[in-house]
Amino acid sequence: MDHVLQFFQQLDNLVWGAPLLVLLVGTGIYLTLRLGLLQIRYLPKAFRLIFTEDEGHGDISSFGALATALAATVGTGNIVGVATAIQTGGPGALFWMWMAAFFGMATKYAEGLLAIRYRTKDDNGHISGGPMYYILHGMGEKWRPLAIFFAVAGVLVALFGIGTMTQVNSITGFLQASFGTAPEVASVVIALVVSTIIFGGIHWISKVSEKVVPFMAAAYIFATITIIALHLDQLLPALKAVFSGAFTGTAAMGGFAGATVKMAIQKGVARGVFSNESGLGSAPIAAAAAKTNEPVEQGLISMTGTFIDTIIICSLTGLSLLVSGEWMARGSTSTLTQDTFTGVFGPVGGIILTLCLVLFATTTILGWSYYGERCFEFLFGVKHINLYRTFFVFMVGLGGFLKLDLVWVIADIVNGLMALPNLIALLALSPVIIKESKQYFKK
């Protein structure tokens, strides 16, 4: 197994090497500059739009689309993923997560805009959209192979990456540590719960997301703010460690082995993308289903997802780890945040975190089931959707039986493969994005 893990780690380093990181962040920087720092100027308007009355064609409300996207993004990456980034990349990794998120907001805006601009209807009358459609309809038929590549990668991510294995693996690990629940039992129960919802399609998924996502996010935010408040004297040193570690690296201390600037950048950006999915091309699949006729407005709503996910939730996770000192402890990344919670709240803290993670991960599974389904439909049509759903549930049930380190590495690899065609499309269609934006904001 060690040789297998080493092979995938080398492949991961290749996929997430300098070229993809430069393309990922560079696309966000380019769009940020061309759109005139849109993520700063129009963020308040974006939040107001979330709660406006929906007008236009679509399957679900704009809030439902955002909730579904947040359901998919707010997952184990916000808890275990942040801990992994800090333990391997040092406190400086948090800074690079922020940078990836800031520029990623412009990327997410562009994705949401194009999703509405180039969406279509399938044979069942449901809305279909996302990168595979704006590649095909925006860039032309000759780019169909790139659209197919994205769709294949999307199915792989849903079935073998973010959508199933990483989420279930983390859930079972936390349930076993907190309640002694056997991973086999937990995996089967999760699979059964997921199956009762995803066979109802996007309407069921969005309804569940609208109810669960605000509650789980608020509960987790309150808990992490409490931890930081109880260690307020350590907040300033923690922030200093974040900024110094981002540019000079972090020396070894306690159980922490040390990290270079390169490690901080690589782990911070990779985990940031895993968490908020900006540039990955997943969120526009949900955005396409929104009831709106205005691409720019849905783009603005979409970019709030990155702000909520990384700038708020991931930051609170990272700072709670740093102020408590748990990030320097020896042990697995899956228990770092749990130790932080139990250190403040006692045994109840472990239960609180476990319940938050179960909700985070379960809603992520639901959101990604829809993403993978739309990609699968693009490849094979609507007739075989139930075959995909059945196999998805099977993979959910399998997730608790695999080694965590290997699962995360595989997830990173397929994430990178999914991001590449989407980023190419965003750059190629940037004139459309800029033109649509200028026309809207002139009104």
Show which residues each predicted segment covers.
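Extracellular/periplasmic helix-exit of transmembrane alpha-helices
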Residues: T32, E111-R119, D123, I225-A241, ...
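Selective recognition of specific alpha-helical transmembrane segments in multi-pass small-molecule
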Residues: F103-E111, V188-I202, V213-D233, Q266, ...
